[in-house]
Amino acid sequence: MSEGDAYEDFMMSEDEEMHYAEMEEDSDEMGVYEEETSQGAEEEVPLDPSSSIVEGRYYRAKGLKENSKFREAIEALEGVATSSEPLWAFRALKQIAKCWNFKGAQASEGYQDGVRTALVRLLEHGLRWRQKLGAAYVERSLISTLRMLVPANSQNFVFDEAHEICLPTIEFHLRLLDAVAPLPGDFKDLCTLHMQLRLENLIWRERLRGADCTAILSEAPAPQLTAETLLLLLQCHICRFLRLCQPPAQQFAELVSELQDRAERSLALAQQPHAMVLLAFAQCMRGMQQQPQPHSALRTHFSACLQGLEEIGSNSSFFRDLNLCGFVLADALAYSAGRCSHRVDPFALEQIRILRETPIVHNLQLLYESYVALDLPSFARALDLLAPFRSALAPLFARLCALARERKLWDAIAPLHSCIALADIQRLLCIGSSSLSRDSLLTLMMQGVMASSARVPFRLDLTRDYVYFGDEPRVQLRAPAARPGLRHCAHDLGLTSACARPFQGSSALQLMDCLSEHRNRAASAAADPADAVCRARQPLAAYRTLAALILDE
């Protein structure tokens, strides 16, 4: 085999060879106004000179069809279809089916009955005369006619919005397919197409009815696993996942692996945006269920989905917004994993920048910015605005909320407080209506120690439910009963009994100098610049009050 032959085999999969042959040898079936060629039939069936009269009637009738005079064309073609010439009768029946198909586009009366009758007559005539007409020619003609009357919905995802697909049309297509069943087994390509179209329309019927699409897979006969069928089965599992938010079944993983293998072997399949979007989103579904979640890989897969949808031209759909949301969530999670130096602002990417004025991007920006700034109230508002996507992306949202609380605890609360009650930490870590229980907080703190993410040492006083942050044990300052508010002020400044002991016997001036130095060091070491600003705004009167408190000790 030469290098050219090998390259052609690589470029063309087995599933595509049949379609290529149809376009090359049976071009008369690919369009309504193209000339009849059917070279295969002419080679197999030499034309009889006596058929010239029938031939002339056929082309005159075809001219009427080309002038959109469908009713007159059907009447003229009926005369050819009932003639004693099998070839011209077969061609006339094909043209009648085309006429009815175009009359259907004009919403004419009797469209469904006319199409069904025309298709059944074409099939019966082809089977009766297939020996004389040539089985290959008959099968190609039936395949192209069936594709015309029952077009595939390959441009729409089963799980996404599809306003142009309606239930009555799907049900008519199923009746049309049932009318020509069963098909002869020796017409393998026709049988494969029939089974594939029937499965597709059954899936769409269940989807438009709001039922579970995967139930059809167990009821319908197992189809031949072509690339088109594989994509259909994969869409069923994705539809079920988005609808019920349940982890995909084992069969789903097998379908993903099969599609990935085929895409690696077939360049034509790998260049289909619909197929690659399905593959990338399926990998996102698998990644979200893994522990730990591969955030960088998820970010890559969601980005591939967005690029594929841009190629398809899906400018406004739930599925596009879902992938947009997943991409930003994965980027935020990767940010938390310490990859800040290698990050690219997600909102600077072209796919998102062109949508910057849309509500979904505004909501995602609020979520992202509040997460980075550890502003949990704003973070909670953003979560509420993204409620339509929280069930499908539940693992990512749950992980982001957990990381937001973890970062808030160790980056904002622990450096700022020397002693704080567990109840106060629970209040500070509340995200909207989702509160953190005492046991969950203690678990979070213990996990921080075990994972070395606890940036500040701490001690727990479980008798009084206090947490002491810092390198050395600290005890709260004792405030006189007449001045209970001083205790809170001391805690906000990080003053404890460990700070008070060196001040015993000191002058007020020395005390103020030590307090100022201690405060400046704390402000410069704060992890969050907002904390330093907050401390710097404490009034000088607080120092004087605390000085009196410490001297009283």
Swiss-Prot record:
It is found in: Cytoplasm; Nucleus. Coiled coil: none annotated. Its main location: cytoplasm. Residues 21-46 have a biased composition (Acidic residues). The keyword Nucleus applies. InterPro entries: 26S_Proteasome/COP9_Components, PCI_dom. Keywords: Cytoplasm, Nucleus, Signalosome. Residues 298-474 form the PCI domain. Signal peptide: none annotated. One of its GO terms (cellular component) is cytoplasm. Residues 21-47 are annotated as: Disordered. The keyword Ribonucleoprotein does not apply. GO terms for biological process: protein deneddylation. Component of the COP9 signalosome (CSN) complex that acts as an regulator of the ubiquitin (Ubl) conjugation pathway by mediating the deneddylation of the cullin subunit of SCF-type E3 ubiquitin-protein ligase complexes. The CSN complex is involved in the regulation of the mating pheromone response. Component of a COP9 signalosome-like (CSN) complex. PANTHER family: 26S PROTEASOME NON-ATPASE REGULATORY SUBUNIT 11/COP9 SIGNALOSOME COMPLEX SUBUNIT 2. This is COP9 signalosome complex subunit 10. It comes from Eremothecium gossypii (strain ATCC 10895 / CBS 109.51 / FGSC 9923 / NRRL Y-1056).
